[in-house]
C-alpha cells in the first residue's frame, strides 16, 4: 500500500467512525440526509431518490441520486466521504442488471420504475440494517436509562444532604433553646 492509499484509508476510517453508511448499490432508493447552511443557520435536508450510479474509488467515491421533483428530473452527486452527509438510509432495494442507470433519464412513468429486489442478498442486507438500527436504538435507550438513574441518585443525595442539614439545624436550634 503506497502512502496516498494509506492516508486515504486513515481519512476514510476517521469519517466512518463518525457515521457508517449502509451498503447500497445502483437501483436502490435511498434517503440522503445532507447538512445545508442557509446564512448562519444549519439544518438537515433529506434528499430521496434512486441511486443511478456509483463511481470513483477511495476518498473520491461518489454516488448519483435521481428524483423527480414537480415533474422535473433532478440529479445530485454526493461524495461518499463528504462531511456534509449526515446519514444515508436505504428505503428499498432495487433489482437492476446495470451499474449505471443513465437510461432512466429518458424514461417517464411506468417505464422508469425499478422492480424491488426480494432476493436472499437484499433480505440479508435489510435484516443486517434493521439489526444495526435496533442496536443503535437500544444503546440510546440504555444511555437514557443510565442518565435517568444518575439524575435520580443525584437528586436522592441532594435530598439526603438537605434533610441532614435540616436535622442539624433543628438540633442546633434545640440546644440553643435550652
From Swiss-Prot:
The record's keywords, sorted A to Z, are:
Ribonucleoprotein, Ribosomal protein
Entries under Pfam families matching the protein: Ribosomal_L19
Does the keyword section mention Ribosomal protein? yes
The UniProt record lists the keyword Chloroplast: no
Give the UniProt entry's GO cellular component terms: cytosolic large ribosomal subunit
The species this protein belongs to is: Rhizobium etli (strain CIAT 652)
What function does the entry list? This protein is located at the 30S-50S ribosomal subunit interface and may play a role in the structure and function of the aminoacyl-tRNA binding site.
Question: Which GO biological process annotations does it have?
Answer: translation
What does the similarity note say?
Belongs to the bacterial ribosomal protein bL19 family.
Q: Which InterPro entries match?
A: Ribosomal_bL19, Ribosomal_bL19_CS, Ribosomal_bL19_sf, Translation_prot_SH3-like_sf
* Protein known as: Large ribosomal subunit protein bL19
The set of disulfide-linked cysteines is none
Amino acid at each position: 500500500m503506497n502512502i496516498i492509499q494509506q492516508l486515504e484509508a486513515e481519512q476514510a476510517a476517521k469519517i466512518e467512525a463518525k457515521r457508517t453508511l449502509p451498503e447500497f448499490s445502483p437501483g436502490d432508493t435511498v434517503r440522503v440526509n445532507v447538512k445545508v447552511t442557509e446564512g448562519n443557520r444549519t439544518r438537515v435536508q433529506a434528499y430521496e431518490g434512486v441511486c443511478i450510479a456509483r463511481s470513483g474509488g477511495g476518498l473520491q467515491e461518489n454516488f448519483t441520486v435521481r428524483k423527480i421533483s414537480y415533474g422535473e428530473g433532478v440529479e445530485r452527486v454526493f461524495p461518499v466521504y463528504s462531511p456534509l452527509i449526515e446519514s444515508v438510509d436505504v428505503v428499498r432495494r432495487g433489482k437492476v442488471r446495470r451499474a449505471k442507470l443513465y437510461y432512466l433519464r429518458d424514461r417517464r412513468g411506468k417505464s422508469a420504475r425499478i422492480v424491488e429486489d426480494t432476493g436472499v442478498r437484499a433480505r440479508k442486507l435489510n435484516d443486517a440494517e434493521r439489526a444495526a438500527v435496533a442496536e443503535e436504538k437500544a444503546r440510546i435507550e440504555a444511555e437514557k436509562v443510565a442518565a435517568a438513574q444518575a439524575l435520580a441518585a443525584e437528586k436522592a443525595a441532594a435530598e439526603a444532604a438537605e434533610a441532614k442539614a435540616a436535622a442539624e439545624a433543628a438540633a442546633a436550634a434545640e440546644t440553643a433553646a435550652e
